Amino acid sequence: MYQLLFELLQVALGNSEHLSRKFTVSQWNQAYIQAKEQVGAVCFGAIEKLSPEERPPSDLLMQWIALAESQRQYYQHYKKVLASLASFYRQYGVKMLLLKGYGLSLDYPVPELRPAGDIDIYLIPESGPICYDGIVKEYADQAVECCWGIEIGREYKKHSHFLIDGVVVENHDTFIDTDKHKSNLRFQSYLENLLVEKTNSNDNKLNENFLLESPVPNCYLPSATWNALFLLRHAGEHFATEKITLRHVLDLGIFFQSHSSEIDWDFVLQVYEKENMIDFYNAISTICTRFLWMNGGYFYGAIDREDLANKVLRDIFTEYKPLPMSNEALSKMSIIHYGVVKSLRWWKNRWKYKMVYNENILESFWGLAVNRLNN
């Protein structure tokens, strides 16, 4: 059912040169629908490599060309907004750490074909100690409000958000959502500790080996070890609470393929084990090796788990009715309905929760149910 989609991704990643056979018009249409939202432009990168005989019918090919061109144009616009934002923060003595997004695209065979979404950032002072108290974030948000006249949304604890030229920016106070999961408090501390080193006065000084320069001035990327923790946890949170897409899998696979030799694997695997994420890691690595034909050597310590990989893939291709991120602006009865529906969905998908969080499942279920009614 998904053979053509995966063969296109294999070609796009350089793991294959040709399709295995000639596919029907119906199969091409199905692959386009499957790919369109998250990996459509990436698949077009494969189509460009194929011989004319292997390509889709001309009418569908034109749709694919339009999709890829739209993505290329947005990517260039996205980069301009990113550069403008980084330059603005530099004037205020603030370094911009980029989470996900553009940094991951740099490892793709054709960076501009990776779908660009929000700009997720974490701000760090150029000098002085790093304090996890939100002061730098709020200082920067007020500067954006004052100088650019842009309204800042502050309703979420995890990050503020604002819109620049059609691009959503999320300015993070924490790297992951520490409000809903106890284990995320531990995970947040792993990420914070990698960012800093203690001084003689017990202040948190920036670990200079942590920040990696990007092609955009004052826009920094995190270390490979940090990303190995953050990216899997970030994808895992999407997976456990709702679902992930093939783009999440591609991001992880391409990241490990590009940076495996830079990762402190002893530390990373220790955290995966402690936080109960090994099964999720094994599932992702198996999808990458079995279905995308990536080299298993990049996924250090991973075990082939075809059973889990197939289960995760079935979930990826299952359509879920979207629910709002919060119950804000819902009526009282709608809030109750929202909480019940979301809790029932979570309970049905508790097998996913067990692959990501090291928590008591009944205690967490009750806590999340109450949280959904209140938020």
Task: Give residue ranges: language-model regions.
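Conserved NTP-donor binding/palm subdomain of two-metal-ion nucleotidyltransferases/polymerases, i.e.
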Residues: 1-117, 123-375
